[in-house]
Design a protein with these regions (language model features):
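Rossmann-fold NAD(P)H-dependent dehydrogenase/reductase core
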Residues: 1-107
Length: 107
């Protein structure tokens, strides 16, 4: 699969970052989504260094907040004419019940 536009959530480390490296190495345009802009910049630098692919963008978003999901979707629509693949990788774990500022329980 090459020359596709692929969005990967949770793409700044772990499985998401490794997937982004492999997908970028195939020549795809990759949108990395994460909460931490510093980790996003480092991820893009690493992917570019390893693959030579510079068709990378970072989108900052906390996917536990609906308002940020809405903002992210607008940013992606404005950046790309189409998205071929959405790889939903973002996740987290907590031992305690966590309620977001929007009143949603994180799972």
């Amino acid at each position: 699969m090459a020359n596709k536009t692929i969005i990967i959530t949770g793409a700044t480390d772990g499985i998401g970052l490794e997937a982004a490296i492999k997908i970028a190495a195939l020549g795809n345009q990759v949108g990395l989504v994460g909460r931490n802009p510093d980790k996003g910049i480092k991820a893009i630098e690493r992917i570019t260094s390893l693959t030579g692919n510079d068709k990378l963008n970072f989108f900052q978003a906390d996917l536990s907040l609906i308002s940020e999901i809405n903002k992210l979707s607008e940013e992606i629509k404005n950046k790309y004419s189409k998205v071929d693949v959405l790889l939903n990788n973002a996740g987290g774990a907590s031992k305690n019940k966590v309620i977001t500022s929007e009143g949603l329980e994180q799972t």
